[in-house]
Amino acid sequence: MSLPAQGRARVVIEHLSPQIDAGRFPVKRSVGDHFTVEVDAFTDGHEQIHCLLQFRRPAETEWHEVTMRALGNDRWRAGFALERLGDYAYRALAWVDPFKTWRHDLQRREDAADIELALEVGARIVEAAAEAARGAQAAWLRQRAAGLRGGKPLDARREQALDTELLEAMLTLASREWASQSATLGVVVDPVRARYSTWYELFPRSAGPAGRHGTFRDVIARLPYVAELGFDVLYLPPIHPIGRINRKGANNRLRADAADVGSPWAIGSDEGGHKAIHPALGGPEDFRALVRTAEEDYGIAIALDIAFQCAPDHPYVREHPQWFRHRPDGSVQYAENPPKKYQDIYPFDFECDDWPALWQELKSVFEHWIAQGVRIFRVDNPHTKPFPFWEWVIGELKAQHPELIFLSEAFTRPKVMARLAKLGFTQSYTYFTWRNTAWELSEYLETLTGSQLAEYFRPNFWPNTPDILHEYLQRGGRPAFAIRLVLAATLSANYGIYGPAFELLEREPREADSEEYLDSEKYQLRAWDLERDDSLRHLIARINRIRRQHPALQRNDSLRFHAVDNPELLCFSKHDPNGGDLVLMVVNLDPFHRQSGWVELPLDEFRLDPHVPYAVDDLLGGGHYLWHGARNFVQLDPQSLAGHVFLIRSNLRTEQDFPNF
């Protein structure tokens, strides 16, 4: 075994965190976050070490530095503010520090002779540092070295030696010749909407009056409604020309009538492909007007669906037949998921010989819509395309546009969903739709927020989608919709609904044991009465207003579940890490019956005095209560209130602190 290149680098650096797969992938944060890093750092013997956190942006050549604080058991911590979008690199640096070691030793000495000798040693260390310094700093250090040797009583010189000003000066001049360095890791900083967003999905073609194909101008007219509900992302299914060959009819009939409009996901016709707009929706200027009006007038970002698949009459099929697989009879292989067949859709062959050109063309689809002002993309079925493609295309696009957000619509196996998030997808759909009991929800959320997944996987909860009408909604009626809304909006900082189907309680399946909607908008135009008395619009607006007003609900990292003696009740809390509000949720999971129980809260964790009452204000239901101690009673009737969203207030001093005063 050969000698090490640097045998005098004695500090061991281990377990730098956070990190994903030994640094293969970056962790994720949002702009404005304070990024905290920890590391194990230690050396042989009893000498003192100095540990730094270094960070920089890709364009920077010099590292910024923060001194790490010892936590005990050789664990160190420091952090820095993430002030800009894009990538940051970070690493730890540590070395055995002679001055810190000497200073620590001096603090323990009591014998005068020992102290006098130690001060001489310290003076020589400071003099050596002065040789490396320049100008006024060098002169100041020589003066401090002389002061350690004499002229003042021993106690005064010892106090001077332990002065923090001297320590800081010595640390800035410390030799790093024998420093140990960790691997360099990365963190990608996304927009705040990556962490906290509220999505509303609608079909533009159903935004017009009954009997007429909707347009982008109709969607512009719908923006006040979407804003009133409190959404800040408006997601549109594909807006491209729809294929005519093998077009599906209403309710997914294999044969379409002349009046059938087809599925927006069967992209492409003689009128154009992925960079074209369906003529009935309007033109490019109409689309740009929608993007501009939504953002400038209502603070709503337009999210566009990207589905990399083609209808049989898509121009790509004619112009680039090599991008598709062909069957022995020469026909193009359509999409299949046996026993299901999708004759109206051709998937790309990512293993074709012309794959570099295919990749570049698909990248250009994103670039086209970015040029039209789109910054958020919902990507359809990314798990059916190669992982290397997504890592490349998202990396290329975000290098130029770090503000981009990509939502992965991959309802697939957990490891596949996690890999897509590691590769660059900003948010992901989840299994929330199929988690309905208290145990299912708590177990799933603890996995999402309490494991390493939380470093890179941002969940986006959807109670419904155009493809998924869960049995819980089908059978539970209006209370079930309210329950799932409250759960999605409070468990996850990112959530969305497919409307107006959701707020208008659309719940009739196409057939028994199906999650498909009857008369689904995927295959036909629908006219919606937004003014219906039974609409959930007011509840939706209220829960979204609560989310905006309480930062605790804009993050997932503080989510905690709490004991309750009734399995039909789910109790959980979130708090603002910046010392702000504490919000407690109790939700009735039973859409049919009134449920009650005793919830038990961790008073120490909440910093509540067990002997002092505290107020709980129901932000959703409007009630105000005075609770005592850890155990308190709740009762919820799903016909009137799906759940409580309590703001907990302590430190009540006078009767005027109570809302009902």
Mark where each language-model region is.
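Alpha-amylase-like alpha-glycosidases and glucanotransferases acting on alpha-linked glucans and related
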Residues: V261-R292, Y298-I300, C310-H538, R542, ...
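Aromatic-lined carbohydrate-binding surfaces of glycoside hydrolases
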Residues: P238-A250, I306-W323
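Generic enzyme active-site microenvironment
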Residues: W199, Y235, A303-L304, R378, ...
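Carbohydrate-interacting/catalytic domains
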Residues: M1-S206, A210-D232, P241, A294, ...
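Generic recognition of short, well-ordered alpha-helical segments
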Residues: G214, R247, P388-W392, S596-W598
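Residues immediately flanking
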Residues: I306, A410, T465, L589, ...
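Conserved beta-strand->loop/alpha-helix structural units within folded catalytic cores of enzymes
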Residues: L223-D232, L236-P237, F287-I306, W369
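Active-site-adjacent substrate/metal-binding segments within catalytic domains
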Residues: P191-D257, G262-G283, F348-L358
